[in-house]
Amino acid sequence: MKEEKKLLLREVEEKITASQGFILLRYLGFTAAHSRSFRNNLSGVSAEFEVLKKKIFFKALETSGVEMDPEDGEGHLGVVFAYGDPVSAAKQVLDFNKQHNDSLVFLAGRIDNASLSGREVEAVAKLPSMKELRQQVVGLIAAPMSQVAGIMNSVLSGVISCVDQKAEKTQE
C-alpha cells in the first residue's frame, strides 16, 4: 500500500474511533455549493462530512474492529462522522435532504455501537429529539397537576360561595 493511502487509512481509523457514530451516504447531483452548505450545517451538531473510497473506508472499519458489511459496488462514499450526538447528525442529514430534493441516500450507519441499515438510520432521524421528548414528558406531568389545581380552585370557590351566601342570610 502506498504511503499516501496508509496515511489516509490511519486518518479514517482515527475518525472512526473518535466519533460517536457515522452515517454512510450516497450523494446524487451534489454540487460544490451543496457540499459546502451541508458541511456548514453538520458543523453545528459536531459532525463532519467526508468523501472516501469505499475500499479505504471498509478497510479502516476492519482495522478499527468495527464489523459492518461492505456495500455493493465501487467508487466513492459519503460519510458523516458524528463527534457529538449521532442522532442529531442524522436529523441534520434528513433536514438537508428534504431541502435539496433527496440528493442524499442513507446506505447504513453506526449509532451507539449498533450497525444500522439505511432505513433504520432514516427512522432514527425521524424520531423526536431528546429535547422534544423532555418537553413531552413535562407536558404529561404538568397536565394532570393543572387539572388538579383547577378542581381544587373550583371546590374552594364553591366553599367560599356557600360561606358568602350563608353570611348574607344571617345578616338578613
Curated annotation (Swiss-Prot):
Q: Which UniProt keywords apply?
A: Ribonucleoprotein, Ribosomal protein, RNA-binding, rRNA-binding
The protein's GO terms of the molecular function aspect are: large ribosomal subunit rRNA binding; structural constituent of ribosome
Fetch the InterPro entries from UniProt.
Ribosomal_uL10 (IPR001790), Ribosomal_uL10-like_sf (IPR043141), Ribosomal_uL10_bac (IPR022973), Ribosomal_uL10_bac_type (IPR047865), Ribosomal_uL10_CS_bac (IPR002363)
Q: For this UniProt entry, which segments traverse the membrane?
A: none
Q: Which Pfam families match?
A: Ribosomal_L10 (PF00466)
> Which BP terms from GO are recorded?
translation
Q: Which cysteines are joined by disulfide bonds?
A: none
Q: PROSITE patterns recorded for this chain? A: RIBOSOMAL_L10
Which range is the signal sequence, renumbered to this chain?
none
Keyword Nucleotidyltransferase set for record = no
Q: Does the keyword RNA-binding apply?
A: yes
Q: State the SUPFAM superfamilies in the record.
A: Ribosomal protein L10-like
Q: Which GO terms describe its cellular component?
A: large ribosomal subunit
Q: Which family does it belong to?
A: Belongs to the universal ribosomal protein uL10 family.
PANTHER family reported for this sequence: 39S RIBOSOMAL PROTEIN L10, MITOCHONDRIAL
Q: Which NCBIfam families did the record assign?
A: PRK00099.1-1
Assembly and partners are described as: Part of the ribosomal stalk of the 50S ribosomal subunit. The N-terminus interacts with L11 and the large rRNA to form the base of the stalk. The C-terminus forms an elongated spine to which L12 dimers bind in a sequential fashion forming a multimeric L10(L12)X complex.
Q: What does this protein do?
A: Forms part of the ribosomal stalk, playing a central role in the interaction of the ribosome with GTP-bound translation factors.
What is this protein called in UniProt?
Large ribosomal subunit protein uL10
Native source organism of the sequence: Chlamydia trachomatis serovar A (strain ATCC VR-571B / DSM 19440 / HAR-13)
